[in-house]
């Protein structure tokens, strides 16, 4: 059994790594805390989430840049450059796959089994939905269908628990709704379903805004703003009666939507 001193030391290193923007080491430290099979505190949970979000975020940004350059080179007919870019893009995809599989193992084997609070359960299933969604951004064919289905299942489990355990204005529940709606828009290519979910949660939360305590007010109102921004963006993609729906992968649209930490 690990001593509380060891746990304290790992958390301190994670804080230092965050300050120094050394996110790979931040992830390593918090993964070691998770491997102790203890229920994480809110701070520990957030450190783990921020670390992985940054580690995966830099690769997602790289992948988008490479995909954009690849499309331009392809349009110019530069086949040799397209092949070079594809090889490099696949390297980034391999890194993304490893990172996402890594956090999924930590969640399934250590974090969820150590959970006692509904809030933590929602947090971890939301994370699972998010990281399967990140895989679905670049996977193709049957692989994409598999990770999309797993993402949907995780978001649905998180939503069921959130509806039973958390008030509608809780930042974790709002963040879940935000990311779940982004999933419908980007991965399922369904602006109608994305808008329906985002609008329902936005309207319910706005009517309960007075119940937000001081600690949650800033985070809650920020996520509500993101929900509203996405609704404004996505509404333009819903066809009027008699019009055709927009073609193409939603993830390739400009400003496909913002998600929460």
UniProtKB/Swiss-Prot annotation:
Signal peptide: none
Annotated InterPro entries: 14-3-3 (IPR000308), 14-3-3_CS (IPR023409), 14-3-3_dom_sf (IPR036815), 14-3-3_domain (IPR023410)
Region annotated Disordered, chain positions: 237-261
SUPFAM superfamilies linked: 14-3-3 protein
GO BP terms, alphabetized: protein localization; signal transduction
GO cellular component: cytoplasm
Subunit structure: Homodimer.
Entry similarity comment: Belongs to the 14-3-3 family.
Family annotation (PANTHER family): 14-3-3 PROTEIN
Protein name (database record): 14-3-3 protein 8
Source species: Solanum lycopersicum
Gene this chain is encoded by: TFT8
